[in-house]
Amino acid sequence: WNNQFGEDEANRDIKTSDLLSALDIGFESHHDQVVYAPGTLRTGQDSPYSVFTPFKRKWIENFDMNFLDIDYKYEKKNATNIKSNLDDFGFEKTHQADMSLWQEGEKEALKRVKIFLKDKAINYSKDRNDPIIDGTSRISPYLALGIISPKRCILEALKANNFEFTSGHIGITKWIDEIVWREFYRNIMFSFPKVSRGMPFQDYSKSIQWRFNESELAAWKSGHTGFPIIDAAMRQLLHEGWMHNRLRMVVAMFFTKNMLHDW
């Protein structure tokens, strides 16, 4: 399995590892959500990074192409039919988005990355912030589910940019930045477990007096707040199962700073 870095998830993986070891069952775990295992990159004072720019600088300084050795093929296993029922696990069936927009599989994910780097990356640095333009890679669902790794994305980006991180194609270097941002926040989650406990990263915000309104929350979730940009974003999520990166930030800020709902 791929390791996860939230406190509960990490503890679950430890317990699972201990149980499998006790039963003499072999297993493998990987840090495949990231290029560097969380906690690997440290400041000169041997403390975890809490600011992105120095983290990115260290990330690039320590980079080795051997990190991207990703061509190992696992032997195909015989399929095991394990019946499952959502009710057994306590899950509820929710609204089904249009999944035809998301062809499954690693080949599809890699195809999307290559098409993006070839056709869209040229304008990515400016188009990425305009949700009316189809200017992003739309690779986030594949990354989130482990269908493609950030290592593979970095490798393809470097190949398309003469193996340069900070020079060359401005759109590609910006896309690499976004992948490093993703890794930075996984390091935050690993290094500062309090954020997994519903506590803010910045202590000064502990004093915020949150409010809660059930009907406002329902309106936000369904895209009926009366604010067009918010409603369009939430309806996109409901319809496509995905939301534009800029809109993710907009609806989150609206939820916390305008509605004053606890994140």
PLM regions: where:
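Trp/Phe/Arg-rich N-terminal binding region typifying the photolyase-homology
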Residues: 1-67, 235-236
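An acidic- and aromatic-residue-enriched active-site/binding cleft used to recognize and process polar
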Residues: 3-5, 30-33, 57, 147-148, ...
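Flexible loop/turn segments at secondary-structure boundaries
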Residues: 7, 151, 195-197, 257-262
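Short, surface-exposed helix-loop/turn micro-motifs enriched in polar/charged residues
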Residues: 8, 131, 167-168, 243-247, ...
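Secondary-structure transition/capping motifs at alpha-helix termini
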Residues: 22-23, 160-165, 240-243, 261-262
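Glycine/tryptophan-enriched, flexible segments
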Residues: 48, 54-204
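C-terminal substrate/ligand-recognition segments
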Residues: 186, 191, 215-261
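Helix-loop-helix junctions that connect adjacent transmembrane helices in secondary transporters/permeases
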Residues: 194-226
